[in-house]
C-alpha cells in the first residue's frame, strides 16, 4: 500500500539531514529571542541567492519574507492583498487551504479546471471564461498538489499572458519545486513575468525533510 497522503516525510522514515540537526543544536542558544519581522537575515539572504540561481527577475532581500510555513504565508497573503468580494481563480482539484484562506479573507474562490485528459494541465479556455470584473488573482500550484503535474514553459507563458491581459496577481505555490524527477525541469512562473505582481511561495519542509522544525 502506497500512502499518498499528507506531505509529512518523518513518519515514513525520511529523516532530516544530520547537518540540520547539528546546526539546530549549535544555534539553539542564539535563537531565543524574536527575529526581524521579515525573518532571519541570513536565511533571507540564502533565499535571495536561490532566487538568483533560478533566475528570478528583480528580486532583492527586501522582497523576501519568511514564516512558519507556506500554509501560514498563504493565509497572510490573502489577508493582506484581498478585499471583500475579490475573486481568485484556484485550480481544481486544489490544495484545500487555498480555497479556505481566500474565503477567510473575504474573497471568493473560483475554481478552474485542470484536465485529467490533458495531463492535468490547467484549461486556459476555462480560466479565461471565469474572469470577471471582480477577479483579482490566479493561483497556480506547480509542481501540482495533488495531481503531480509539472507545467511546461509554453503553458506557463499562456497563464502569464492571461494574467497580463487582465491585470491579475499570480500566486505560485512551488513547495515541490525540488522534487522533480525523470530529467524534467521546474520553471518558476516569476521568471516569465518580470512585469507582473507575482507572489512565489516555497519552503523547506518537503525538500529538506524538516516539516516539524518550523
Question: Residue spans of the language-model regions?
Answer:
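Active-site phosphate-binding strand-loop segment of PLP-dependent enzymes
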Residues: 110, 115-184
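Helix C-cap/helix->beta junction micro-motif
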Residues: 105, 165-166, 196
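Short acidic capping loops at alpha-helix termini that bridge into adjacent secondary structure
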Residues: 58-64, 84-87, 134, 195-198
